[in-house]
Amino acid sequence: MKVLLLEDVKNLGKAGEVCEVKDGYGNNFLIANKKAKLATNEVINKYKAEVKKKAETEALEKAQKLQMAETLQTVTLTIHKKVGANGSLFGAITKEEITERLKEHHANLNLDKKDIELKHPIKSTGIYEIEVKLGSGIVGVFKIDVVAE
């Protein structure tokens, strides 16, 4: 019997492959445990269409993330904070504060605080480059200008 593997099966094949197996193994193990489907033309064509649609969706999402990374490069946030006599801030600028400011000034950039990478806490005035992990290995960078009030 021919089956279309829905997931990787050790010593048999990878997901998406059509394999020839014995009837008992196919029916009692692979199909029963939803690791494979009976390989008819309809099932194979449907699987290929799903894979193609998934690839198109991933390509579209990656293009959107690249566009967001380009947009982020043009962003410079200015944050006003109280400063002590030695030039250091009272407290540090947090990821949460950065995401709130981004949402205020750039509503189209929808980022979560866990996406922001701070190499070290921001505790003094100056210009800092902030990295944002957008997924799919894409990293965006924008600048923050910390100014004394």
From Swiss-Prot:
Q: Give the matching InterPro entries.
A: Ribosomal_bL9, Ribosomal_bL9/RNase_H1_N, Ribosomal_bL9_bac/chp, Ribosomal_bL9_C, Ribosomal_bL9_C_sf, Ribosomal_bL9_N, Ribosomal_bL9_N_sf
Q: Which UniProt keywords apply?
A: Ribonucleoprotein, Ribosomal protein, RNA-binding, rRNA-binding
Which GO-annotated molecular functions does the record name?
Answer: rRNA binding; structural constituent of ribosome
Q: Does the keyword Ribonucleoprotein apply?
A: yes
The record's listing under SUPFAM superfamilies reads: L9 N-domain-like, Ribosomal protein L9 C-domain
One GO location term (cellular component): ribosome
Pfam families linked to this entry: Ribosomal_L9_C, Ribosomal_L9_N
Q: Which GO terms describe its biological process?
A: translation
* Tagged with keyword rRNA-binding: yes
Q: Which HAMAP family match?
A: Ribosomal_bL9
Q: What does this protein do?
A: Binds to the 23S rRNA.
**Sequence similarity:** Belongs to the bacterial ribosomal protein bL9 family.
Instruction: Write down what this protein is called.
Output: Large ribosomal subunit protein bL9
Organism lineage: Bacteria, Pseudomonadati, Campylobacterota, Epsilonproteobacteria, Campylobacterales
